[in-house]
Amino acid sequence: MLRSMWNFLKRHKKKCIFLGTVLGGVYILGKYGQKKIREIQEREAAEYIAQARRQYHFESNQRTCNMTVLSMLPTLREALMQQLNSESLTALLKSRPSNKLEIWEDLKIISFTRSIVAVYSTCMLVVLLRVQLNIIGGYIYLDNATVGKNGTTVLAPPDVQQQYLSSIQHLLGDGLTELVTVIKQAVQRILGSVSLKHSLSLLDLEQKLKEIRILVEQHQSSWNDKDVSRSSLCQYMMPDEETPLAAQAYGLSHRDITTIKLLNETRDMLESPDFSTVLNTCLNRGFSRLLDNMAEFFRPTEQDLQHGNSINSLSSVSLPLAKIIPIVNGQIHSVCSETPSHFVQDLLMMEQVKDFAANVYEAFSTPQQLEK
C-alpha cells in the first residue's frame, strides 16, 4: 500500500508539488483574509465608537451652548438698560415737566434703539457662542481622545479655555457700546422727524425697521454730514486684531499664543460667508418675532371689524407713535429673557444655527486639527 502510494507520488511528482503549493497558498491566503477582515471589523467598530462618542460630546456641547446663552442674557439686558435708561425718562414724564415734548422725543429714540439693539445683540450672542463653544469643544474632544498618549500636548488647557471664552465680554462691553451708538444714529435718522401724533400700522413699523437695518448693516449713508465707512457686524463681537494680546510683541506665554490662535480661528469663522448667512437669518427671524410680539397690540377693535377691516391685514390698525413707544420700550424683557421665551427658543432651535454649529465642531474635532 505504501509502496504503491510512493510510486504514484514519484510518477506525479510535479503535479503533487503544484497541488501542495496551491493548497498551501489557499490556506495562507485564507488566514491572511481572515486577519484582514478582523482588522477591518475592529477598525470599523473603533470608528463607530469614536463617531458615537464625538456625536454624544457634540450634543452635550450644544446643550451647554444653550444654557450659556440663557445665563448671559440677564447681563446683556442689564447692560442695555443701563446704557439706554428709558425708565428714568418715564419717571420724569410722570412729574409733568415743562419740557414734556422734548422728553417724549428722547424716549422715542431710546425705546426703539433699545429694542433694536436687543435683537441684534441677542442674535450675535447666540451665533458667537455657537462658534466659540464648538471651536473649544472640538479641541476638548481631541484632548480627551489623545489623553494618555506619549508625546501629546494638551491643545486647550483650562486656563486657555477661560482666557479665550472671556473674549465674549467685548460684545457685552465696548462692542455693545459701539453698536448702541450706530443704531441710535440710524433710529434718529429714520424716526427723528416722525411726529408723536403720526399713526403707524404694523406694516409701517416693519418698513421702518428695515430702513434702520439697512443703515446699520450696510453703512451706505452718512450721518451728521460725515462719511461712515463700511464695516461688518464682526467688529461688535470681537476686538480688532491689534488689541490686547495680539499687540504684545514680546513676553507672550504659551497660553497667550494658544489663545491668540483660537481668537484668530474665531475671527476667520466670523468673517466667513457661512457665518454672515447664519447671522442674517437669525436677524430676520429675530425682527420677525419682534413684530409678532407687538402684533397683539394692533388687533382690530369691534368698531374696526364693523367697518369691514380685515383681521389679517397688517395695515388695518394704526396707532399714534406716542402709543407705540411704550409697546416697543417693553420688548427688551421678552427679547433678553433668561427664561426660555419664544424669541430665544426660535434662535436656539433654528436648523441653520444647528447645521452651522455642527460644521464648526466637525472642523475642529478631527485628527487633522492636531497637525496644524
From Swiss-Prot:
Species of provenance: Mus musculus
Gene Ontology CC: endoplasmic reticulum; nucleoplasm; peroxisomal membrane; peroxisome; plasma membrane; protein-lipid complex
Family: Belongs to the peroxin-3 family.
Spans through the membrane: 16-36, 117-140
The protein's name in its UniProt record: Peroxisomal biogenesis factor 3
Cellular compartments annotated: Peroxisome membrane
Function in brief: Involved in peroxisome biosynthesis and integrity. Assembles membrane vesicles before the matrix proteins are translocated. As a docking factor for PEX19, is necessary for the import of peroxisomal membrane proteins in the peroxisomes.
A single GO BP: protein import into peroxisome membrane
Membrane topology according to the record: Multi-pass membrane protein
Tissue distribution: Identified in all tissues analyzed, with the strongest expression in liver and in testis.
